[in-house]
Regions:
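Core catalytic DNA strand-manipulation module of type IA topoisomerases
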Residues: 2-258
């Protein structure tokens, strides 16, 4: 995508921000997206290149800015399927910066029953805004709302309202073990391994090293090297895949005990 088709910017960056001057090129970039990914034609009609999202922030840009589409265009059908998917992900994230804000009305209800306090949160969507681009995504942590929020309209409730508890139930549950790593969560955790270090001085040193680095909180490697680190662990037989999960092997656990 970058070297052959010139469709995206430097692809080994983990920065999520853009320099302010990039905003001046927004119109040209959006036009290029429309030429390359015609499936975004309708969405582009709702994009406003004059909008400036929080992603445009000079202070948050490190050595390289976020990965975005370029002003170049190409024949989408000539791209491999994997290249098509990656370009669409990058283009959609860029396009979302020029959509209106997602707006909702939140109602928080706190009530007392038999000297026990209960709390309920409900969000009523007013305008989908940029989230309309992600309607069909399932399990996307970037756009998921509050886990405990209900999609109900509770705005008619008033302070002091009374009600009757018509039923209740108790569901026995067991504490679940931490979720297995996936490639995404493992890469994310490599940016903040300091939280697992028991040596206080070493932990503080790692955190201090990453001070003022967006997205880094005492990690190992860089965005450009972490994939190689993980690949090396697979090659040495320390990691293996089980379905979508990445787990340690017996060799890795034996080595850890040495």
């Amino acid at each position: 995508l970058r070297e052959k088709y010139k469709l995206i910017t430097y692809n080994r960056s983990d920065c999520q921000y853009l320099n302010d001057e990039h905003h001046e090129e927004a119109g040209d970039v959006l036009e290029a997206i429309g030429k390359t990914a015609v499936m975004f034609s309708n969405a582009l009609n709702f994009a406003d290149a004059s909008l400036k999202s929080r992603a445009f922030n000079n202070d948050k840009v490190s050595a390289h800015h976020a990965i975005i589409p370029t002003k170049a265009s190409a024949d989408f059908s000539k791209l491999k399927e994997e290249e098509q998917r990656i370009y669409l992900l990058i283009a959609r994230a860029y396009l979302a910066q020029f959509f209106p804000a997602y707006k909702f009305k939140q109602t928080i209800v706190t009530l007392e029953c038999e000297q026990v306090t209960f709390k309920c949160i409900a969000n009523l969507e007013i305008s989908s805004g940029w989230k309309s681009l992600y309607r069909n995504d399932k399990g996307n942590e970037e756009v998921i709302g509050e886990v405990d929020a209900l999609a109900l309209d509770l705005t008619s409730l008033k302070v002091g309202d009374q009600g009757i508890c018509v039923n209740s139930s108790v569901n026995p549950k067991e504490t679940k073990p931490p979720a297995r790593y996936t490639m995404d969560t493992l890469l994310t955790d490599l940016t903040r391994v300091a939280k697992y270090i028991r040596d206080e001085d070493l932990r503080k040193a790692l955190i201090e090293r990453d001070k003022n680095k967006a997205g880094e909180h005492g990690g190992i490697g860089t965005a450009a090297t972490r994939d190689a680190i993980i690949s090396n662990l697979f090659e040495r037989g320390f990691l293996e895949e089980k379905g979508n999960a990445i787990v340690s092997t017996k060799s890795a656990r034996d080595f850890y005990e040495i």
